[in-house]
Design a protein with these regions (language model features):
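N-terminal, post-signal peptide beta-strand-biased segments of exported outer-membrane/organellar beta-barrel
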Residues: 2-11, 15-103, 108-111
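Outer-membrane beta-barrel porins/channels
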Residues: 22-25, 53-56, 60-64, 82, ...
Length: 402
């Protein structure tokens, strides 16, 4: 087959590692760089520009005090950056080790609804939620022959977060803040891969364990004299399964696909003082018992499929379709969408047989989340309507064998 492994890597590794999926997922946590032949290194950077908005609730009441603009404005940081890197070393013909870096989980929501009223600007509602993670996976692989690769290894992960709530819509939680100090914890991964190099065929199945973080959390209560309380809270990032497959269909064309499952249903963020305040006031409003800061109703399933065409020894192009199921959560500022459909394209330049440069662009159209269901737990900052939200991801990646 004339289609080279570098042509495959250029686009697969560019799109596979950048994501704007369900929950807080920001990476597909692919194992693909580790499956490259020989010694290999890569570095990638991508940026997301999102336009995500909706309309607030209680519009009739707001109109009575002269408010006519019910739009939330853009709910997310317009310039979300993705960084990935990998080094894979073939220590012996039958033994390899990899170091894979990504930022798999995170969110950057900064929303403030402060419309003009008959008495001037009024703080109705504001939400600031920011989570950030760093992940280093260290798979060690055993290759008994040219086809099989069995691998496992530790996953080192840090996670931190902050939440701020404000505005009259929050009543007793107006002014609440929570700071989850950065925590380091460990998980593990394992999997296997089968390949037939002569026809560029490769398939892999990998599993990542959940990672349990125990945070030192600092919460500030919105009372006459602000009180800061410290405590502990636990957050478990989700376990996941990835399946990837690719094969050449001619001397110049290769098709590929991937499927990913993530267990978001067991993920939640509920600091202790936040819960205690809700419990205390639930005597007056029983619905407060079910309020969750961050929680997801369903697990996530996502898929990608694409075609790579090799034009000559220097240039290849790719086209890709993507789909994400979402987590079926109610419409809110924290969940303005429920999955997406996407389409992308990429261009790969082969500097020589060992080095490639790749650039790509991916357009995402988000599906609208539904308004709150009676079976859901109450959510923070519910919305009455979602806009036609979308995002664009563009990125660059370089890789080389050595």
């Amino acid at each position: 087959m004339n289609i080279s492994a570098l042509a495959v890597s250029g686009v697969l590794l560019l799109f596979a590692q950048t994501s704007f999926s369900a929950g807080m997922e920001k990476s597909s946590q692919t194992i693909m760089p580790f499956l490259e032949s020989g010694n290999y290194a890569e570095l990638g950077i991508a940026q997301l520009k999102a336009d995500i908005s909706g309309q607030v609730q209680n519009q009739d009441s707001l109109a009575q005090i002269g408010i006519s603009d019910f739009s939330t404005g853009n709910l997310v940081n317009k310039n979300y950056l993705f960084i990935t890197g990998a080094i894979k070393l073939q220590l012996r013909p039958d033994l390899s080790v990899g170091f894979l870096f990504d930022k798999p989980f995170g969110t950057d929501l900064d929303y403030r609804y402060r419309p003009e009223t008959v008495i001037g600007p009024l703080d109705i509602e504001s939400v600031r939620v920011k989570f950030d993670s760093n992940n280093i996976s260290i798979p060690v692989g055993y290759q008994p022959d040219a086809h099989w690769n069995f691998f496992a290894g530790p996953v080192l992960q840090t996670l931190k977060g902050e939440v701020e709530l404000g505005g009259q819509n929050y009543y007793l939680l107006n002014g609440y803040t929570s700071d989850l100090k950065q925590d380091f914890s460990m998980g593990w991964l394992a999997g296997l891969s089968y390949q037939i190099p002569e026809i560029a065929f490769r398939t892999s199945l990998s599993y990542r364990s959940p990672v349990k973080h125990t945070f030192d959390v600092q919460e500030q209560l919105p009372i006459a004299t602000p009180v800061t309380l410290t405590g502990k809270t636990t957050v478990k990032t989700p376990q996941s399964v990835n399946f990837d497959i690719q094969t050449a269909v001619s001397t110049t064309d290769l098709i590929y696909a991937s499927l990913r499952w993530v267990e978001w249903k067991d993920f939640y963020v509920q600091p202790p003082t936040f819960q205690e305040v809700l419990n205390a006031y639930s005597v007056y409003d029983s619905s407060l018992k079910n309020v969750s800061m961050i929680q997801y109703n369903q697990n996530q399933l996502s898929a990608k499929a694409g075609l790579i065409h090799k034009w000559n020894s220097d240039w290849s192009t790719a086209h890709e379709l993507s789909w994400d199921s979402g987590t079926d959560d109610s419409l809110s500022t924290l969940n303005p969408s429920n999955g997406y459909l996407g389409i992308g394209g990429g261009l790969i330049y082969h500097y020589n047989e060992k080095i490639f440069l790749a650039a790509g662009l991916h357009y995402i159209r988000f599906r609208k989340a539904s308004r709150q269901k009676s079976t859901d737990s109450n959510v923070i900052a519910s919305l009455s309507k979602a806009a036609n939200n979308h995002a664009i991801i563009y990125g660059f990646k370089t890789g080389f064998h050595f």
